């Protein structure tokens, strides 16, 4: 047996050991004769977001009680808006309510509608299960994924137990996406993004939400995780232009100290949005980002630069990345409503100055194809022919277009390598020709709402209070899978790959190898019930208010 065969056998055994630990659940790595620990109640230590605190929570303050009452009153408005989605999806009221905050019970259904997960599931029946099984057998990054899963949202009650239900679902999603989109594969940020989706969506819905988030041109997140990196460069250039215009002293100091090339605020921003601030503010910013799209990225970085202007001018070259990250986090150490209020004002200001989006990309040499695009959301005219399509065959996912594209309608679908689907589109009402209404201008930001015509349509037979909205309440977040995924998915795998068999058993697990994980000591001693603590008491109901409310 040569070295290659030995290495391949070792990697296969390592994959099987990791998968086996997640299949065993909470008891992974514990002695067989060790009995279960007494069940611990977290009722007095868990806040309304699901974060477990070390000590018992104090009574609600008047401000917190007011926020709870406000969220309950907004719940009925969001339910009505979801029930009449065709009316509200292109309205300003949707954006106004997104900045005010989505109720926790509505966030899952709303994210699902915004990212069109139901349509993706209908178009790809059984695809997620097949990708998951392939990932289990051939993942090249399963050790990194396992290490990152062990440190993702560990203070949340869903992810507190090592090898628990939600950690197993998170592992499955990341393995499936690595197989689904080889261009991106896996990177650490995906673990946190998928974990946020799992807080409010079932496993398969969270997978398709992740797929849509990275593949959607409106959100343009794939550029942050793709080797091409087009998104990062385009937004970085626009950020330098905006900062140089609004804070020339800050940008001059950054250039003088040669800090711009060493620390990317936009790269830091993505990490801040998923792992650097309080969970409540993180969710509120993600609500705005999913509704607004990539236009929200520039205002967020602009606020951070503005608030930290004095500190940034004193930043030396010694450790600029660490200094900037720490001060960037300090920007958000304040009231959530205040942050969202400043974000809305920054969005309006940048839209008025046409600085919310990067300028159109310059045409590349040797390319003659061009298409008309508007200059910005608030622009009056179209810059016809000011950018050209990149030459050469398309990648697995089309690279983001650095201009505010007009509304688009699907024309045909083209399968791409890696399981992706690329839609050939044209501007709505134009058939490839610029619309006269867009070319002649209109009210400021008028076409900005037209882009919602391309948003997913809500099913006409939808019952808002019905079973379509799984995870509508935290009660349904405690579901326990009774049948293993291996047993359920074996027919799907054998149907597509008759020459292969679904593995029915794995090798014996090895000892835990999570070195350096802060939760390792606790994980080795954990053996809570498989279902985990019930979150039935976490949903917002008026009956849970303190006396007097």
UniProtKB/Swiss-Prot annotation:
Keyword Chaperone: no
GO function terms (MF aspect): GTPase activator activity
Domain Rab-GAP TBC residue range list: 101-293
Compartment(s) of residence: Cell membrane
InterPro entries (alphabetical): Rab-GAP-TBC_dom, Rab-GAP_TBC_sf, Rab_GAP_TBC_domain
Transmembrane segments: none
Keyword vocabulary terms for this entry: Cell membrane, GTPase activation, Lipoprotein, Membrane, Palmitate, Proto-oncogene, Ubl conjugation
Keyword Transmembrane helix appears in the UniProt entry: no
SMART domains for this protein: TBC
Signal peptide coordinates: none
Tissue: Expressed in liver, skeletal muscle, kidney, pancreas, spleen, testis, ovary, small intestine and peripheral blood leukocytes. Overexpressed in prostate cancers.
Ranges of Low complexity composition bias in the record: 398-417
Topology in membrane: Lipid-anchor
Annotated S-S bridges: none
Positions where lipid (S-palmitoyl cysteine) attaches: 318, 325
Post-translational modification: Ubiquitinated by a CUL7-based E3 ligase, which leads to proteasomal degradation.
UniProt main location, coarse: membrane
Pfam families noted in UniProt: RabGAP-TBC
Miscellaneous remark of the record: TBC1D3 is encoded by a collection of very similar paralogs with multiple copies of each paralog, some human genomes encoding well over 50 copies depending on ethnic origin of the donor.
Protein name: TBC1 domain family member 3
Organism: Homo sapiens
């Amino acid at each position: 047996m040569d070295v290659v065969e030995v290495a391949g056998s070792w990697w296969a055994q390592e994959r099987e050991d990791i998968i086996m630990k997640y299949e065993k659940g909470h008891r992974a790595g514990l002695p067989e004769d060790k009995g279960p620990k007494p069940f611990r109640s977290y009722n007095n230590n868990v806040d309304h977001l699901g974060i477990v605190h070390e000590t018992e929570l104090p009574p609600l303050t008047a401000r917190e009680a007011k926020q709870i009452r406000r969220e309950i009153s907004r719940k009925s408005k969001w339910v009505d808006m979801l029930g009449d989605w065709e009316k509200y999806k292109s309205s300003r009221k949707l954006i106004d309510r997104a900045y005010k905050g989505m109720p926790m019970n509505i966030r899952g259904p709303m994210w699902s509608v915004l990212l069109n997960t139901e349509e993706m599931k209908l178009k790809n029946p059984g695809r997620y299960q097949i990708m998951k099984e392939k990932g289990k057998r051939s993942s090249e990054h399963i050790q990194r994924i396992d290490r990152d899963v062990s440190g993702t949202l560990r203070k949340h009650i869903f992810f507190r137990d090592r090898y628990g239900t939600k950690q197993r679902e998170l592992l499955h999603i990341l393995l499936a996406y690595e197989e689904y989109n080889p261009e991106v594969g896996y990177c650490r940020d995906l673990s946190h993004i998928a974990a946020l989706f799992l807080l409010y969506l079932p496993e398969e819905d969270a997978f398709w939400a992740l797929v849509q988030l990275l593949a959607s041109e409106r959100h343009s997140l794939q550029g942050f995780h793709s080797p091409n990196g087009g998104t990062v460069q385009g937004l970085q250039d626009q950020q330098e232009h905006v900062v140089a215009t609004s804070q020339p002293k800050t940008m001059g100091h950054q250039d003088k100290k040669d800090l711009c090339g060493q620390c990317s605020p936009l790269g830091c921003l993505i990490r801040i949005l998923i792992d650097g601030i309080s969970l409540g503010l993180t969710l509120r910013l993600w609500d705005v980002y999913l509704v607004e799209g990539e236009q929200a990225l520039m205002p967020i970085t602009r606020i951070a630069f503005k608030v930290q202007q004095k500190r940034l001018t004193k930043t030396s070259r010694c450790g600029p990345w660490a200094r900037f990250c720490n001060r960037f986090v300090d920007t958000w150490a304040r009231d959530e409503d205040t942050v969202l209020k400043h974000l809305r004002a920054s969005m309006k200001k940048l839209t008025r100055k046409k600085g919310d989006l990067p300028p159109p990309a310059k045409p590349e040499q040797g390319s003659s194809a061009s298409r008309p695009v508007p200059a910005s959301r608030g622009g009056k005219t179209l810059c016809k022919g000011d950018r050209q399509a990149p030459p050469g065959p398309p990648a697995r996912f089309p690279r983001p277009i650095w201009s505010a594209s007009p509304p688009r309608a699907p024309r045909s679908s083209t399968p791409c390598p890696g399981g992706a689907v690329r839609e050939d589109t044209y501007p709505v009402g134009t058939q490839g020709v610029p619309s006269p209404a867009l070319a002649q201008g209109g009210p400021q930001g008028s076409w900005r709402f037209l882009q919602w015509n391309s948003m997913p349509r809500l099913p006409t037979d939808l019952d808002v209070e019905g079973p379509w909205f799984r995870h509508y309440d935290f009660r349904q977040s405690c579901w326990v899978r009774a049948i293993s995924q291996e047993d359920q998915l074996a027919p799907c795998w054998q149907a597509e790959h008759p020459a292969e068999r679904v593995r029915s058993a794995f090798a014996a697990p090895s000892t835990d190898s999570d070195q350096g994980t802060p939760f390792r000591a606790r994980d080795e001693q954990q053996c809570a019930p498989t279902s985990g603590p019930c979150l039935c008491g976490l949903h917002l109901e008026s009956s849970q208010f303190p006396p007097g409310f």
